Amino acid sequence: KWNKTHPDDQAKLTEPQYAGTSSEGGSKAAEALMAANPKLDALIPAGGGGDPLQGAIAAVERAGKTGKIAVVSTDFLPDLGERLKNGSMAGQSGGHYCDPLIAFMTVYNAIKGNYKDFEGKFEDITFPYLFVASPDDYQGYEKYFVKQLPFTDQELVDMSNLSLEGLKEAATKISIEDAAARFGK
């Protein structure tokens, strides 16, 4: 779809480069991609925000292409706010707070007996990843998901009484914007 609607900005996907689980692997994969594609303007180190991502960022920095190659990935880095400011990261998805919270609330409600005929069934609860693409986005994430809980004490109590469908609905709404709106900010 992108290429059809953006004829002057064609996206070209490269063959994946396996980086392993080390910083060195991420660095070598990024270097290989940059060497094979001199016009490379975006890089998506997959597999999380750990060592391979750090290595890829370092390779882009060594090549003098910080800000020229947009780097995006998953799993928030501890210094993501600074990286968004200096241009070494263009965006990142992650902030998996909602996954353990919703899992805990599901188990808690099941143990309390709030879910009838639940035994042996599989339920899929979908929730959006949090996405940050600017220092302001990161400040919102840090404020509502790192420095405090994204829910008030009363909201957590209310959540502990939700039906499974209600919990699924609550999960779909989790976002930085939702937390800010609920806290009136």
For each of these PLM feature ranges, what is it?
Residues K1-K185:
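A residue-level marker of the well-folded mature domains of exported/periplasmic proteins
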